[in-house]
From Swiss-Prot:
Entry keyword set: Ribonucleoprotein, Ribosomal protein, RNA-binding, rRNA-binding
Stated name of the protein: Small ribosomal subunit protein bS6
Record GO cellular component, one term: cytoplasm
NCBIfam families to which the protein is assigned, alphabetical: S6
Molecular-function GO terms, alphabetical: small ribosomal subunit rRNA binding; structural constituent of ribosome
Cystine pairings recorded for this chain: none
GO biological process, any: translation
Biological function: Binds together with bS18 to 16S ribosomal RNA.
Listed Pfam families: Ribosomal_S6 (PF01250)
Family, per entry: Belongs to the bacterial ribosomal protein bS6 family.
Annotated InterPro entries: Ribosomal_bS6 (IPR000529), Ribosomal_bS6_sf (IPR035980), Ribosomal_S6_plastid/chlpt (IPR020814), Transl_elong_EF1B/ribsomal_bS6 (IPR014717)
Keyword Ribosomal protein part of the UniProt annotation: yes
Length: 119
């Protein structure tokens, strides 16, 4: 499985509870439709935008880190496109985190092998 990061920005004029439901809906979509394993959900809340987005100067930011095969990522894109509450979204493959994870796994494996040799 590959590691991905998705950031999405929700309109600020929606009630806080509703924005929370929308963010949780994205997480549920990832789990159900993409069979993704969620590593972390980071809700930033309302922040100023770098420039106006559809006449909004601030928006609600959320970042989700997840693991998936990547086969159905276009479904995630469509999920965001058809819902007007999203101002922007972007999904990245996090190759740096994948490499870091592999490197850590190799170190653990090496330590285990060294311990077996010493016994």
């Amino acid at each position: 499985m590959r590691i991905y990061e998705t950031m999405f920005i929700i309109k600020p004029d929606i009630a806080e509870e509703e924005r929370e439901k929308i963010a949780n809906g994205v997480v549920e979509f990832l789990k159900e439709k993409l069979n993704a394993q969620i590593d972390n959900v980071d809700r930033w809340g309302i922040r100023k935008t770098a420039y106006p987005l559809k006449k909004y100067n601030e928006a609600d930011y959320t970042v989700v880190y997840f693991r998936a095969t990547g086969e159905n990522l276009n479904e995630l894109e469509m999920y965001f496109k058809v819902r007007p509450e999203f101002l922007r979204w972007q999904t990245f493959r996090r190759i740096d985190l994948e490499k870091k994870e592999r490197k850590t796994a190799k170190k653990v494996e090496t330590v285990e092998n060294t311990e077996k040799v010493e016994e």
